[in-house]
Amino acid sequence: MAASSSGEKEKERLGGGLGVAGGNSTRERLLSALEDLEVLSRELIEMLAISRNQKLLQAGEENQVLELLIHRDGEFQELMKLALNQGKIHHEMQVLEKEVEKRDSDIQQLQKQLKEAEQILATAVYQAKEKLKSIEKARKGAISSEEIIKYAHRISASNAVCAPLTWVPGDPRRPYPTDLEMRSGLLGQMNNPSTNGVNGHLPGDALAAGRLPDVLAPQYPWQSNDMSMNMLPPNHSSDFLLEPPGHNKENEDDVEIMSTDSSSSSSESD
């Protein structure tokens, strides 16, 4: 009778334990199932020992304890499967956490690189905008090449490019002949009709014809017409534009030298 009463108490405890174990973690449920299996196994062994010694135990009570033990063992096996699945899931979670940490590190590195690239691109865009502004400003204030050439000619004609070593501010000397020096020189005297006959550097026929040889003709288009017309007499015609009979090699060399000087003086005076 004591064994039957203990078996009934065990049934009540197991029933209450199953109701409470439903809201616990898997680990607690496994521990509870192990304790129940241990208690049921001990109870079954005691019942078998008593029935063997005294032969007073009823067969129904032994079967009930055995059924409870089998049922509890089935629950324990289910919990073991659940624990294994949860262990696999936990392992996968750990792997995923490591992967997430790695990806997070990669994202931070990429974010750093993107910030650097953004800064570089912002600088490049700013510089490009400034260049576009400069280009637009240059287009609006464009200057023709002729104006630049004229301005360069004025600078070269009115400013020195290489001053003497003893030159000081206010010194009138220049590293090139001034307009006054050019007019008082040999070339300036050649252009003066009153002194052409005295110098004798040009052939007599050319002077008599009232013209300069072709090599002495001005090299600038804006001077050629005016100077040629000034050198021609009123009754001059195009029939006299042939080379003079007295033209020779010596006079040609002198004329070439003087023509070079004439070109330089014309550019400076303009």
Swiss-Prot record:
Gene Ontology CC: core mediator complex; mediator complex; membrane; nucleoplasm; nucleus
Name of one Pfam family that matches: Med4
Modified residues annotated as N-acetylalanine in this record: 2
Bias kind Low complexity: ranges: 259-270
Region (Disordered): 1-22, 226-270
Coiled-coil zones: 24-48, 90-131
Modification Phosphoserine, positions: 32
Function in brief: Component of the Mediator complex, a coactivator involved in the regulated transcription of nearly all RNA polymerase II-dependent genes. Mediator functions as a bridge to convey information from gene-specific regulatory proteins to the basal RNA polymerase II transcription machinery. Mediator is recruited to promoters by direct interactions with regulatory proteins and serves as a scaffold for the assembly of a functional preinitiation complex with RNA polymerase II and the general transcription factors.
UniProt subunit comment: Component of the Mediator complex, which is composed of MED1, MED4, MED6, MED7, MED8, MED9, MED10, MED11, MED12, MED13, MED13L, MED14, MED15, MED16, MED17, MED18, MED19, MED20, MED21, MED22, MED23, MED24, MED25, MED26, MED27, MED29, MED30, MED31, CCNC, CDK8 and CDC2L6/CDK11. The MED12, MED13, CCNC and CDK8 subunits form a distinct module termed the CDK8 module. Mediator containing the CDK8 module is less active than Mediator lacking this module in supporting transcriptional activation.
Protein family: Belongs to the Mediator complex subunit 4 family.
Annotated protein name in UniProt: Mediator of RNA polymerase II transcription subunit 4
Organism per entry: Homo sapiens
Annotated gene: MED4
